[in-house]
């Protein structure tokens, strides 16, 4: 992970696939949310997802996925991250935009 950028990779199993043997949509969204969160928090602050818009272009039966998140805009409280997910042949499978809300510094512990 570097400033304003994060990469999440996953090797797929039968648990990540649908009945047709292709990747389950929830797997794509989970990876995308992790990549968006990683890119957002690369500035040392903690973020939560408040919204996303996601598009599925094609599916795959390959065994490895790479999600890449890049910050497009960062303000005091909001961070907008674009995410793309590709397979190991670098074919674009899906992507989206995530809006993240800053909830504080990474090292803080919530008070009761």
Q: How would you label these PLM feature ranges?
A:
Residues 1-21:
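Catalytic strand-loop segment that frames the active site of acyl-thioester-processing enzymes
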Residues 17, 21-22, 33, 65, ...:
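Short glycine- and Lys/Arg-enriched binding-loop motifs that mark or flank ligand-binding interfaces
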Residues 20-41, 49:
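Compact, glycine-rich, soluble single-domain proteins
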Residues 60-62, 66-68, 72-112:
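HotDog/MaoC-like acyl-thioester-processing domains
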